[in-house]
């Protein structure tokens, strides 16, 4: 009986850790998206177009090397 109780508590703790990990990941992704959209808003459309073009050239050149 005691072993079952200990096993259940370990399982509950593992589930808690998984849930907390998911929450942390979701919060970090949310903050990252907020930062990205804030930067896009501050830079404006013309700057983003130039950055996207430069990034595209960089990716293509990296793939060709």
Curated annotation (Swiss-Prot):
Topological type in the membrane: Single-pass type II membrane protein
UniProt keyword rRNA-binding, yes or no: no
Main location: membrane
Residue ranges that the UniProt entry lists as topological domain Cytoplasmic: 1-18
Annotated localization: Cell inner membrane
InterPro entries: SafA (IPR031411)
Periplasmic compartment residues: 40-65
Induction info: By acid stress, via the EvgS/EvgA system.
GO CC terms, sorted: plasma membrane
Spans traversing the lipid bilayer: 19-39
Function, as annotated: Connects the signal transduction between the two-component systems EvgS/EvgA and PhoQ/PhoP, by directly interacting with PhoQ and thus activating the PhoQ/PhoP system, in response to acid stress conditions.
Quaternary organization: Interacts with PhoQ.
Entry's family note: Belongs to the SafA family.
Record-given protein name: Two-component-system connector protein SafA
């Amino acid at each position: 009986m005691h072993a079952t109780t200990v096993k259940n508590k370990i399982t509950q703790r593992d589930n808690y850790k998984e849930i907390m990990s998911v929450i942390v990941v979701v919060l970090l992704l949310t903050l990252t998206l907020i930062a990205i959209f804030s930067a896009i808003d501050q830079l404006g459309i013309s700057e983003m177009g130039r950055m996207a073009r430069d990034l595209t050239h960089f990716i293509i050149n990296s793939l060709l090397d």
